[in-house]
């Protein structure tokens, strides 16, 4: 999927079934390395990143069958250095490191997804594993790690909140000797889901979802069954789709509790929202959104993965809105494409200022990443005219059947 034709002037209404969380499913798949037991995992989304992760596991010797529900047997792992051509495709491949070290005492991987030390906090992963007793050598963009005997439990104070590093340390500590405490840990729902999965296999983890996670190491893990949580970012994206188009939507098979901050902002924008056990209903019919001031923050704050979508919402809102990005650098690249579509946006340091206009215009735009792809497609749906969105190959990394789901609620999107 390289290029999409998107027809504008659409009001998006209807029902959407939310897929499983990519950000929970990916690490959970890599956590299966920790056990020889047979595992069954449900609600796995069909995404390119997931498929690459499965190829990585199979390369290591893991046996996998099934589709949305996977049966996994990691008892025959016999390779500890995955190939560069797979590791380089997804940043999430860093999560192979902790489980391989914990179970086998050795691992060798290339730096994932073209990451550079310092640009994304890969160094936090390595520092955490070093504190657990691993010896790590970094040379020629390759991480060579080993430990004599078992990893050793430790009190680890994270210098910066990091979802990825919290996952790496938590997974490695499950088989360490003694107890590990991760202080200043990430609190995301995905962390809670991963801990729940590991505990199902026999791990002893308490405190996931708080800033302090305690892991009592065990000798080995067993098999088990787990259902991956719904994707809160996909849910939020569809809610914004309806809000920006002045439509109404019901998202099914989702978890409202994971979206408290997003729902608060949508309500502030003027949407009527109702929630149930596993559904969210949004109604913005006949109302132009009000502008919002947003600052991204670690969970339970406003998610960085939703700021591009809300920039679109601010672009067509009444008033002037701001979005301040505190998690990642260079996350406003997409704004130049919204400006092509008529949006009035100014960038000042790590903040964008959106001067709301009534209507965007169609254009030929280029997406720079996963969330930008979704945002520009939504922009095309509500703009006047036909928009061509290029470089949409990013989309299938994190959204399952996104154009198809949008078409079911009133969009007209075609693959060119």
Swiss-Prot record:
Residues involved in phosphoenolpyruvate binding: 22-23
CDD domains: UdpNAET
Official protein name in the record: UDP-N-acetylglucosamine 1-carboxyvinyltransferase
Compartments (UniProt record): Cytoplasm
Family: Belongs to the EPSP synthase family. MurA subfamily.
Pathway it works in: Cell wall biogenesis; peptidoglycan biosynthesis
Catalytic activity: phosphoenolpyruvate + UDP-N-acetyl-alpha-D-glucosamine = UDP-N-acetyl-3-O-(1-carboxyvinyl)-alpha-D-glucosamine + phosphate
Broad class of the protein's primary localization: cytoplasm
Modified residues (2-(S-cysteinyl)pyruvic acid O-phosphothioketal): 115
GO-annotated cellular components: cytoplasm
Gene this protein is translated from: murA
EC nos: 2.5.1.7
Disulfide bonds: none
Organism of origin: Buchnera aphidicola subsp. Acyrthosiphon pisum (strain 5A)
SUPFAM superfamilies referenced in this protein's UniProt entry, alphabetically: EPT/RTPC-like (SSF55205)
Root EC class: transferase
